[in-house]
């Protein structure tokens, strides 16, 4: 008896063939389903991810929510160190207060709060340094071969680095494995401590199907953005870094996404029939 499994194999193919370039120093666009690279510019060049680091920070939390070791209603205590973290963006947590994991996630994803990242890191791993080790273990596990994390926030450290391609791998993994939590990345505002902040992802406010991920900026590496968009049944993921301004980041990233949807399409190449079981017929008497 032969049992076959029919597998539909997809491939992203160039439909029209127009050329595009970008002012970003490093960039990549991948198909969200197949992982195929649709565009690249220095995609494996080391860069400082800045707040795009927080994609991995949230991934660690999502993983623990998914396996049941955490719940959204669990609370984390704010340490003095986390409370004092006011460099860069902040959720404005208060020392010695207990904050729900769900609120901290929104503080990280929507408000890009460095303080919220430290609260999460310390409560999950004891110290931010130990949390960074967890981040690196996960990076290796999902195939990020040119990445090293030293903190949960993306604050500049010469040893906190990644590549556009590795960040695309990270983004694809998070989206595909944790759809029940990924929707938080599409939220456009969050209020905490009577301070309402808007999501820093500029493409969420454009009518182009973008539904999440993170911006990043450091003076040493410029402006970056990991963004994902849906058009019908297709998803693309764009990661750029090294733009000289927020305006160029927004325009450049949106151009790459629009181009990828216009110039590529997924087609079924063939059906692969895989033999699962073979049983020899019984001999006749």
Where are these regions (language model features)?
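Sterically constrained small-residue positions within well-ordered secondary structures
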Residues: 6, 18-20, 229
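Domain-terminus/edge residues, biased toward the C-terminal soluble/receptor-binding domains
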Residues: 144-148, 156-161, 165-280, 284
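A generic local structural motif
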Residues: 14-15, 224
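Generic signature of intrinsically disordered, low-complexity, basic-rich segments
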Residues: 11-13, 135, 249
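Active-site-adjacent loops and short helices of periplasmic peptidoglycan-processing enzymes
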Residues: 15-165, 172-176
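Bacterial N-terminal signal peptides
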Residues: 2-11
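Generic marker of residues within folded, mature protein domains
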Residues: 7, 39, 66-68, 219, ...
């Amino acid at each position: 008896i032969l049992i076959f499994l029919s597998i539909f194999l997809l491939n992203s193919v160039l439909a029209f063939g127009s050329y595009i370039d970008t002012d970003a120093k490093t960039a990549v666009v991948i198909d969200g389903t197949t992982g195929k690279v649709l565009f690249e510019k220095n995609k494996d060049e080391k860069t400082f991810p800045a707040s795009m680091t927080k994609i991995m920070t949230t991934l660690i939390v999502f993983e623990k929510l998914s396996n049941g070791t955490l719940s959204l209603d669990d609370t984390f205590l704010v340490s003095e160190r986390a409370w004092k973290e006011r460099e860069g963006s902040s959720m404005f947590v208060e020392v010695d207060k207990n904050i729900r994991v769900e609120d901290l996630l929104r503080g990280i994803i929507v408000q890009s709060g460095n303080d919220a990242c430290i609260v999460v890191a310390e409560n999950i791993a004891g110290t931010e340094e130990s949390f960074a080790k967890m981040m690196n273990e996960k990076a290796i596990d999902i195939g990020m071969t040119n990445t090293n994390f030293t903190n949960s926030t993306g604050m500049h450290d010469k040893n906190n680095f990644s590549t556009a391609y590795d960040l695309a791998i990270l983004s694809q993994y998070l989206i595909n494995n944790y759809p029940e939590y990924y929707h938080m990345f599409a939220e456009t505002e969050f209020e905490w401590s009577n301070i309402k902040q808007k999501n820093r992802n500029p493409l969420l406010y454009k009518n182009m199907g973008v539904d999440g991920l993170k911006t990043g900026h450091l003076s040493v590496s410029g402006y970056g953005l990991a963004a994902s968009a849906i058009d019908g049944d297709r998803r693309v993921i764009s990661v750029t870094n090294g733009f000289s301004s927020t305006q160029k980041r927004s325009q450049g990233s949106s151009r790459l996404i629009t181009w990828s949807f216009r110039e590529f399409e997924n087609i079924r190449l063939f059906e692969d029939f895989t033999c699962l079981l073979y049983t020899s017929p019984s001999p006749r008497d």
